[in-house]
Design a protein with these regions (language model features):
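Pro/Thr/Ser/Gly-rich low-complexity, intrinsically disordered linker/stalk tracts
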Residues: 335-388, 441-475
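Solvent-exposed loop/turn segments flanking beta-strands in beta-repeat/beta-sandwich domains
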Residues: 382-407
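Aromatic-lined carbohydrate-binding/catalytic grooves of carbohydrate-active enzymes
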Residues: 54-90
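Beta-strand-rich modules
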Residues: 422-443
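Catalytic domains of carbohydrate-active enzymes, especially glycoside hydrolases
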Residues: 42-69, 167-171
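Aromatic-lined carbohydrate-recognition surfaces of secreted/lumenal glycan-active proteins
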Residues: 108-120, 174-175, 193-239, 285-288, ...
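Active-site-adjacent "subsite" loops/lids of carbohydrate-active enzymes
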Residues: 16-18, 22-24, 28-42, 95, ...
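Substrate-binding cleft of secreted/luminal carbohydrate-active enzymes
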Residues: 246-247, 251-269, 286-355
Length: 480
């Protein structure tokens, strides 16, 4: 079975699929690479443009680094990656900028929260935190860690996540290192250890969902949940080694999504990927792939190690996540070029069907105005039957009726908030359909426009080339 999956042909592109990347800020290893505010902003925009053009629809940006942050707060100090001086403001809000720029490109932005590790014992973040809470931080070597066995740890992290949720229009809260550190000598039973970690997750879930229940709560567990009947985890797994019951969190509704760190290949990858799929309980799973392992300074993996994993994950209905951004955008061994072709057809984020939320009403008064070069489509807003704060709109185009909204090749604009769009038609007769989508990803029934007349025939349109998030590319070529 596994061999058949690996050798199978490229799976059909699904309409719903998570295509994610971890954007790492610690030490500026992915971003930023300069302490100049102007340069930082330009670099972030360039990175997000590259990700968008490769079909990425989810950005996990490292927001809490090591008891330090990339947003203004009195809770913890600024991380030093922004200015070179921990505790010093860069003069703007990087998290807000990333959210705005992701949304402008039709991508989700999740705040990546490093939970238990708080950095060097005498580092700015750890030092300030242990001055406030001297009994909460444990020293192991020269590193500090929040104590997962103390209830105050869950309270603190829940309050921190609530602050991010309250202040920012993030699409997700993504928990990292939500487990016992591998260097921690666990003295309680594994069952009790799992309960301690689950208690923290429960507190964070309640804090986030009470404010904005549409926000996806996720984590990045160890890549192997536990030993399988035929395949062993070699002593390094989530459930037993570090008391991280990630599959149980999906089952019990504490998590909406998992991004397992599956930095493996062969039989260390495929059986465990299937295990995550079989225990996803209808939630989102998008395994992390080790694109960094292709670098000659790492393990020098061949490109086809990653591309086969991508194909198999798509075939079994899982998304994928790249670790980490710079190795991806640097096109290590051609991974960026491959992914851009692999994701040529756009994808929406899977809807949160487990919430039971009702889809919005259809849009009203859909109109089309045609000029010699473009169609302008406009509509009136739909009615949101959920508790979300605003609606998003998806636009589909086809040269035939009815417009098939189940075919992702027809998607030309995703997750846009505006109530109109201009589409270059290249002289062809196009039909359009518009759907409303709530913050849970539930999509309304489509409303279609009739064709707006016919002009002289031109070569067939490639709708995928038109997409640029919730905007459309102009057909005039741009030289780089």
């Amino acid at each position: 079975m596994l061999l058949a999956l690996v050798l199978s042909a490229k799976a059909q592109t699904p309409k719903h699929e998570v295509r994610a990347v971890w954007l790492t800020t610690i030490g500026g290893i992915d971003w930023p690479h300069s302490y100049s505010t102007t340069t930082q902003k330009a670099e972030l925009i360039s990175i997000l443009d590259q990700l968008q053009q490769a079909g990425i629809n989810t950005v996990l940006i490292q927001t809490r680094v090591r008891a330090t942050t990339i947003f203004p707060t009195t809770t913890e100090p600024w991380d030093g990656c922004l200015t070179g001086h921990p505790g010093t403001s860069p003069g703007y809000d990087p998290l807000q900028m990333c959210i705005d720029e992701c949304h402008r490109r039709g991508m989700e932005c999740h705040a990546w929260i490093v939970t238990i590790p708080v950095g060097k014992w005498n580092g700015t973040g750890c030092k300030q935190l242990r001055q406030k809470y001297p009994t909460l931080i444990k020293k192991i070597g020269d590193e500090g860690y929040m104590n997962p066995e103390m209830p105050q740890t869950g309270d603190y992290l829940a309050n921190f996540c609530a602050e991010v949720t309250r202040k920012y229009d993030v699409d997700g809260i993504h928990l990292d290192y939500i487990r016992y550190p591998e260097t921690w000598k666990i003295k309680v039973t594994r069952q009790q250890g799992r309960q301690y970690i689950t208690d923290i997750v429960t507190k964070i879930n309640r804090a986030v969902k009470s404010l904005k229940p549409w926000i996806k709560l996720s984590c990045s567990p160890i890549g192997k949940y536990d030993d399988l009947s035929r395949y062993r985890s070699s002593g390094w797994n989530a459930n037993t080694t570090v008391c991280q019951d990630a599959q149980g969190w999906l089952r019990d509704g504490l998590m909406d999504a998992l991004f397992p760190m599956m930095y493996f290949q062969g039989n260390n990858f495929y059986p465990f990927a299937i295990d995550w799929h079989e225990h996803s309980y209808g939630r989102i799973v998008a395994p992390g792939l080790a694109v960094y392992m292709m670098h000659p300074r790492e393990k020098n993996w061949d490109l086809d190690v990653i591309t086969r994993e991508m194909s198999v994950l798509r075939q079994i209905g899982l998304g994928c996540t790249f670790f980490r951004s710079k190795f991806f955008t640097d096109n290590t061994k051609g991974i960026y070029d491959f992914t851009r072709d692999f994701n040529i057809v756009p994808a929406l984020i899977p809807p949160m069907t487990w919430t039971g939320k009702q889809a919005p009403s259809a849009v009203a008064q859909l109109k089309i105005k045609r000029s010699m070069t473009a169609d302008n489509i406009s509509w009136q807003k739909a009615v949101d039957y959920s508790d979300g704060d605003y609606l998003l709109y998806n636009v589909y185009a086809s040269e035939s009726l009815p417009v098939d909204i189940n075919n992702p090749e027809n998607l030309i604009a995703v997750r846009q908030r505006e109530l109109s769009i201009t589409v270059p038609h290249k002289g062809r007769t196009l039909h359009y359909a518009v759907t409303a989508m709530n913050r849970y990803g539930m999509e309304s029934k489509p409303v279609e426009t009739p064709a707006a007349g016919t002009l002289a025939s031109s070569k067939p349109l490639n709708f995928q080339q038109m997409i640029i998030g919730n905007k459309l590319k102009k057909y005039k070529s741009k030289k780089k």
